[in-house]
Amino acid sequence: MTAISIIENRSNEVQLPQWLQECLIDQESLESDSDALLICQAFNFAYQLHEGQTRKSGEPYIAHPIAVASLLRSLGGDSVTIAAGFLHDVVEDTDVTPEEIEERFGVQVRLLVEGVTKLSKFNFSSTTERQAENFRRMFLAMATDIRVIVVKLADRLHNMRTLEHLKPE
């Protein structure tokens, strides 16, 4: 499937930002631009893995990773950070392992995706206990790579922007 037909197929489902459309159209000529190639490959992988999944709003799930990656790009994120934005839910929501992420996208992307996944995993009985653990994990993630926190914040920001689709609890 050519990059242009990929865009045509996907545009029926979700609006692709201009920067991503340009990346996909130029995909064949990206061999010399490893940063753009990494971003396009991460998008394609996330798209395949999230195909058929929907958000509570009913929109295709891939709209969320696109929004997260777009936020990261607007903040000046590097290609590794933007790729992690596309892939941040892949380990949590599919059968893909961190090892497969590393094999396909490198150790830096794996570490960011794993860091974001670990920030989401714990459940606690008390609010105080939960808040203390959240701060502890956030500080540990910042000590390792601040980009983990930036990806997680972009994820949360997009989730907050789409809260109207959740049931009030």
Across the structure, where does each feature detected by a protein language model lie?
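Active-site helical microenvironments for divalent-metal-assisted chemistry
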Residues: 1-169
